[in-house]
Amino acid sequence: MKTNKLFAALIAALLLLGMLFACAPADIAAAPANEATNLQEVDEIPAAEGTGIETIDMMGREIKLPEAATRIVALSAADCEILYAIGAGDLLVGRGEFCDYPAQVLDVPAVQSGMETNMEQIIALAPQVLLMSAMAQTEDQVKQLEAAGIQCVVSDAKDINGVYQAITLIGAVTGHDEDAFAVVSSMETTLSELSVHASELQGKSVYFEVSPLQYGLWTAGKGTFMDEIATMLGLTNVFADATGWAEISEEQVLKANPDVIVTIAMYFGEGQTPVEEILARPGWQDITAVKNGDILNLQNNELSRPGPRIADGAQALFDFVKAIVSENKAA
């Protein structure tokens, strides 16, 4: 039991670290890039002559490969998901230690990643390409990797449009352009259809809990995927006035009185589920969402990880709130 609690605490801390450091360090050199990039611009990025590939990564760096990569190390969980989604998962020869989806990625050798990435482990795997986020390495580390013949490609989505760009970029690097386009098109279709029906959710208010009470409450404010999806669905994020991932108090949640609570806390099979824990919190019984039991637990990173399943998370949230609205109408 104690082990599970410690593991849960570690997971919560890692999730917050990944969210809080979703920006580039000052010492990574970046070429100038357009601040606003839409899907149409992204679709025009790949430009290949013969078997060679030329593209621009998400730090504005020019990427040139003699041919589509066949050996890849991906440090971020989102990039691993993208590779499998576009049918290129078999190209992975190494992954960041926190990459966990889909299940088959766990069969790929793991390398130490995050703030203490192990350069020697990566070089030993002899990849042609390393997929990394903007905050993953310093400029000196990038030079070390590229001196070893490894092309570093930055994939760093900060909004839904950035996810489209990341998928398109990885499709270009792997020669899976058409598969990438299909994934992006499917996501666009899903999200577009949801936005058309946003009025059906009646502007319900929602509180996103990204870290549970026992580890300190954190929520998603402006500039996060969760807030972007809430806005798309016509929902009101009760902490939209916060910026990024914000630490909050119980009193602030009680005052906000959300109609719906979305928690991404993990459950490891012992004790209360995340929903049961929220329902049992002293003093929370007067919150509308708690009073009505309108609490959604999404444990699989659909709303927090910048990958293809963002659309699935949006669909799950829409369906949950739509059911609440329908039930209220029937009452």
Feature annotation, model-predicted:
Residues 5-7, 11, 21-78, 177-207, ...:
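Bacterial Sec-exported substrate-binding components of ABC uptake systems
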Residues 49, 162-165, 172, 181, ...:
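Structured C-terminal subdomain patch of bacterial secreted/periplasmic proteins
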Residues 58-60, 109-120, 242-250:
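Short helix-initiation/N-cap motifs at beta->coil->alpha
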Residues 71-125, 129-135:
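A short, structured surface patch at a secondary-structure boundary
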Residues 76, 134-135, 210, 242-245, ...:
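Short secondary-structure boundary segments
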Residues 98-101, 217-245:
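Alpha-helical, coiled-coil/dimerization segments enriched in small aliphatic residues
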Residues 138-141, 153-169, 203-225, 269-272:
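Extracytoplasmic ligand-binding site segments that recognize negatively charged/polar headgroups
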